[in-house]
Amino acid sequence: MSTPDPPLGGTPRPGPSPGPGPSPGAMLGPSPGPSPGSAHSMMGPSPGPPSAGHPMPTQGPGGYPQDNMHQMHKPMESMHEKGMPDDPRYNQMKGMGMRSGAHTGMAPPPSPMDQHSQGYPSPLGGSEHASSPVPASGPSSGPQMSSGPGGAPLDGSDPQALGQQNRGPTPFNQNQLHQLRAQIMAYKMLARGQPLPDHLQMAVQGKRPMPGMQQQMPTLPPPSVSATGPGPGPGPGPGPGPGPAPPNYSRPHGMGGPNMPPPGPSGVPPGMPGQPPGGPPKPWPEGPMANAAAPTSTPQKLIPPQPTGRPSPAPPAVPPAASPVMPPQTQSPGQPAQPAPLVPLHQKQSRITPIQKPRGLDPVEILQEREYRLQARIAHRIQELENLPGSLAGDLRTKATIELKALRLLNFQRQLRQEVVVCMRRDTALETALNAKAYKRSKRQSLREARITEKLEKQQKIEQERKRRQKHQEYLNSILQHAKDFREYHRSVTGKLQKLTKAVATYHANTEREQKKENERIEKERMRRLMAEDEEGYRKLIDQKKDKRLAYLLQQTDEYVANLTELVRQHKAAQVAKEKKKKKKKKKAENAEGQTPAIGPDGEPLDETSQMSDLPVKVIHVESGKILTGTDAPKAGQLEAWLEMNPGYEVAPRSDSEESGSEEEEEEEEEEQPQPAQPPTLPVEEKKKIPDPDSDDVSEVDARHIIENAKQDVDDEYGVSQALARGLQSYYAVAHAVTERVDKQSALMVNGVLKQYQIKGLEWLVSLYNNNLNGILADEMGLGKTIQTIALITYLMEHKRINGPFLIIVPLSTLSNWAYEFDKWAPSVVKVSYKGSPAARRAFVPQLRSGKFNVLLTTYEYIIKDKHILAKIRWKYMIVDEGHRMKNHHCKLTQVLNTHYVAPRRLLLTGTPLQNKLPELWALLNFLLPTIFKSCSTFEQWFNAPFAMTGEKVDLNEEETILIIRRLHKVLRPFLLRRLKKEVEAQLPEKVEYVIKCDMSALQRVLYRHMQAKGVLLTDGSEKDKKGKGGTKTLMNTIMQLRKICNHPYMFQHIEESFSEHLGFTGGIVQGLDLYRASGKFELLDRILPKLRATNHKVLLFCQMTSLMTIMEDYFAYRGFKYLRLDGTTKAEDRGMLLKTFNEPGSEYFIFLLSTRAGGLGLNLQSADTVIIFDSDWNPHQDLQAQDRAHRIGQQNEVRVLRLCTVNSVEEKILAAAKYKLNVDQKVIQAGMFDQKSSSHERRAFLQAILEHEEQDEEEDEVPDDETVNQMIARHEEEFDLFMRMDLDRRREEARNPKRKPRLMEEDELPSWIIKDDAEVERLTCEEEEEKMFGRGSRHRKEVDYSDSLTEKQWLKAIEEGTLEEIEEEVRQKKSSRKRKRDSEAGSSTPTTSTRSRDKDEESKKQKKRGRPPAEKLSPNPPNLTKKMKKIVDAVIKYKDSSGRQLSEVFIQLPSRKELPEYYELIRKPVDFKKIKERIRNHKYRSLNDLEKDVMLLCQNAQTFNLEGSLIYEDSIVLQSVFTSVRQKIEKEDDSEGEESEEEEEGEEEGSESESRSVKVKIKLGRKEKAQDRLKGGRRRPSRGSRAKPVVSDDDSEEEQEEDRSGSGSEED
């Protein structure tokens, strides 16, 4: 063994390669993991020995057979004997031996292939059970001690025992092992090209052992010591499987794993650190300190391992300082490996037991394992095929046999293939393989080959050309591709830009949304402050917003309120000055006379005729101080005599509240008058010093005073004391500067006690009196405005000693009610009801002149008519009931009161202060306070913007609307007091209103459709002698005709007459159930009224048209309903009797039939609890007035208001217009909450709710069924059940009738002349138009007098005196005499004509009376009337203003339709003065009223077309007043000419007034017959159309006059 064999027969390669040798054994690569065992050692306990069928050969180190391992140990022993333990080859072989020790006794489990490879040798010829090279995947579980068979720890110093423990019996002895290690070390050094030292050569040859090798092994510590030694390791990890720890082990140099450090600078292996300089060589160091010092001795820097593709396992459980294995230092490429210097042999090295790193993946072993598995599968398949059953099918058995033989041939085929390959390799020579050209033979070129070469060259050129073309094509394709890429790039860029743009837009949208939210938040905050009346905060937010419009509105409001405040101050100062002047004048007169007559309590001298003589005078006993008041006190007229009879008494001094002011107060006021800047003086009670509430000495009175002041601080503008105490000159505080507390009613009021809210109203009225102001008491209808007025009068009489006279102007219908209330509440007040005939009124004149009365009650008509009597009295107070009658500033009543009557204090009573427009409200305020509210245009300019229906340039938003409405509330609040029933009268039952939609009958639908489309009414043709063929009749005022059709089609007389013939009735009148079948509203009444009568509910039924009331009377007679009727023709004295009869507890009348205008004012009908409004009024307040006849104080039951409305008709439009007008009223009046106690927050919340309510949808247009109607009219469940049973009984009864008909008329029941298509109606209409134009003969007209026979005053007088028929007869006789006179004058003017010709003319005139062609001239008017008309028109045309400009210049002639087409589109009836003059010449006007109508129409057209405030608009208003004044002047001149006696004066006045009324009542000649028929109980058809119109006073607005005139046909038909 002189020559050391290289282990495993590998040939060492020279060079610096650090890689392993060519051995394919266990040294194929290092294991990177911490476990030195195989992968099988981590998969659980090792299985038992292999089966007997698979004997395993004896394995040596590294998994090799024992014989191979024996060959490897021979060189190791020789190296050990030669003393070469330091040789690298020795260490390498020793490492191989240690690696094999790790696998000893731990053979891998048999693979699945081993169980089936029965007798088949391995194709590779190696061991079939080589250890798997798979690294351990789990970290170490901690240090474990290796134990022997007895469980005792093994000593690492005994290698033989270690080897036997690890590998079983081994053939190597100790010397052989040393020699093997030396050979391994030598192999390593030779592989690196390093020279072998002598001792290593000797050790390799086995001559002597390596120095230090003998000492190395015994000194090695056991593996447990190194594993558990101290050190700051990273913590224990899960160790490898149950395999024992490896022995001392050192990897060969250059084959270290990735975690091994490089060798040191002295060539010492990593586990053997060099000796420190200057010290002798030491033996093996003991303890871990040497291990810790080992890495510090290497000067090279340690480089961490490079990461690999596999996850590295956790580090071993060895402290880093004690670990002999360090990370390798990666050698940079290109750097030659420097040979390490040899270590001196005598150097003692410290050897530490290394820990085996896990092996890496071995691809050879993986391949082997794959082969094993294939072999196993093949063997398994052969076994399956051999064991196939014999019953298999033939073809399957053949296939299985073929497969079995093929599998058995596999090994033979593999052996044959190997042999063929070996033979082929032997044929290959060494030189041929190295140099292929060495034996190449040169070839000669022949001619044939030259041609071939040429041909090939040509082919080559073609090929080159083809390649060139192909290259060019590729170039073009690349260009196209580039273009495509270019487009794609820019498309992507564009897409990115679009995305960016979208993102920017989204950002801005989000930003804008956020900004909008912020603005909305600020706006809500602003609205909140505005609603809370936080004016300071609101102004700050307005300044932040920079809203010029809102700031401008606030500025305007401040300026306007400041101006009004100043005007109120001036008004009060002027009133005070007047009072002073009057008192001074009276005092001077008394001083001049030198004697003082008897002075009454009011400071006036007393006489027998004084109006103060009947009032009690308060007296006091001088000694006892006893005061006598009321009935115990003496009368004023008997005061002196009573004082003589009762000595010791004298007149009691008047209190401060009773006196209007003493002389000292007058002097103080004179001194204070030149100082307007000072706040108004506080009352005596408020001038007291308010004590400090924090002080201890606060009396009970002072505490109560403090509480009152705190209570007044709650509201903003009603806290007068608080405002004055702060020195704030608020508008309301200035107006109501003087306050007086009223706790109870006057002692003169008896038979009842005022409610608390009525006491508050009285206090407000007294405050108006004390502050010299006038106001509007606008409590809702039914809250007792009459009682509060009587309380004011009695309070003034008792406490202020103002005994009158008081003028109270009321409607005629409520005059009796006022007299009744005075008799009940204040019987001691002397009242005069100024009404009746002229003789009766004249009887009151002496009493009026003497002044022996306190109150005068009269009507609007007598105020105008008897102004020469009533205006002579100086009234202390003027009170106008239903003050909204003065809503037109130009109405006659307002002008007469302003010009003729003297009354320093005025009061208006109205339940509806705002009915249609804001100028109406201004008219009321102007009448009350003309010095404060001067200009209507200014008032409208300030407050009309939110309510203007046309001409509004900019729509106001909600906030601006609230600001403007709030401005109006500020203006109105001092002068208007309004309380609602729901606020002040809690015990008043609820009022519920329902709108019940009614369907139309077939007759109504047909008539309505043609009237709506063409404006014509279908007839049967009888008026044209085409009876039964049908015809049409054109009617004016289509809306009125549509309303009549909706109410009842029989309101048209010819329709009822035709249907009476069609249905078989005689007399032209329809009776029975066909009365209600023709109208949807009547059919609904037929279902409702029996239920109401059965449950004892009294009904008020309001109608607009008197002819409809007549038809309704026929229906009531048919059903047997007891009823009462009240309309405009009912006398005043009869009205009271009707009310009394209806209100009696046991009255048999359960229906009261009233007209809305006549029966809607001042009537107390609280015994009824159901109100049915048959047809709605254009003015919603008329309907509200009508409802409140039942819903007023004294009502005990819940009130149901049922408003009937025909579905899809003009009535829905009327209802919508009424709602709009009510909406205006809500915004202005109700939202102001002028009730003296509502706080600002409540007012703002109410206004906000109104504005939000506008956005709600309207109700659906559907006709309710019986159940829904029953729910509307039933008050409780029992009534509802009863009504449902009644409906069921009614339907059963109708079903039993064999001749039953539908509830409403069907189309198949209509006559043929009604059912016409549109084309036929168009043809009939054209025929009628042609007849009108060309005059085909005269039509038969009924004898109806259309002239104005009586004025309204004459008619009222005749009604009151009961001489209507006689006066009408006289008028007819006068007309006939005038007519004969005109005829005689015409005959005398033509004396040459014969009598015969004159008789013929008269006959022709009589014939022409029946029907005249349109082209024929009208009969001439009286010359006096024509002269008046011309005079009036000329005066209006020539009128000039102060600058000399003629106002009527633009009104003379209108521009043509071509010049101004929009005027004719907007104005339906254009008229000018030229046309008016022409009509006067053609005698078109039959009275001054007709002329006035056209002049007013001209002015209204100008106001409609032109903007408000323009020059033409203002001129038209002036021309209206000029016309009125000129007409009055001319009428007065006529009146003065005929005054000869008082009787004649009365007659002449009534005669002249016949042409001064704006609305005429047309009396038909058949009235007498009608009255007789009604007395007899029968009814003639003309009676339905011969009712007179309700009385409409001429103080109504022009707009309502026109509506009433246009509706005259509806009430007369």
From Swiss-Prot:
GO molecular function, one term: DNA polymerase binding
PTM annotation (Phosphoserine): residues: S610, S613, S695, S699, S1349, S1419, S1536, S1541, S1552, S1593, S1597
Region named Necessary for interaction with SS18L1/CREST: 1-282
Annotated SUPFAM superfamilies: BRK domain-like (SSF160481), Bromodomain (SSF47370), P-loop containing nucleoside triphosphate hydrolases (SSF52540)
Catalytic activity: ATP + H2O = ADP + phosphate + H(+)
Main location: nucleus
Basic and acidic residues biased stretches: 74-89, 1396-1405, 1566-1576
Regulation: Binding to RNAs including lncRNA Evf2 leads to inhibition of SMARCA4 ATPase and chromatin remodeling activities.
Biased composition (Pro residues): 1-23, 231-249, 259-286, 302-327
Phosphothreonine: residues carrying this PTM: T11, T353, T609, T1390
Residue ranges occupied by any Helicase C-terminal domain in the UniProt entry: 1084-1246
Range of residues in the leader sequence: none
Domain Bromo: 1420-1530
Placement of sequence motif DEGH box: 881-884
Residues the entry annotates as binding ATP: D779, E780, M781, G782, L783, G784, K785, T786
Skewed-composition ranges (Polar residues): 162-177
InterPro entries linked: BRG1_ATP-bd (IPR030100), BRK_domain (IPR006576), BRK_sf (IPR037259), Bromodomain (IPR001487), Bromodomain-like_sf (IPR036427), Bromodomain_CS (IPR018359), Gln-Leu-Gln_QLQ (IPR014978), Helicase_ATP-bd (IPR014001)
Annotated ranges, domain HSA: 460-532
Subcellular location field: Nucleus
Motif (KIKL): 1562-1565
Chain spans, region Sufficient for interaction with DLX1: 837-916, 1247-1413
Protein family per UniProt: Belongs to the SNF2/RAD54 helicase family.
Full protein name: SWI/SNF-related matrix-associated actin-dependent regulator of chromatin subfamily A member 4
Organism: Mus musculus
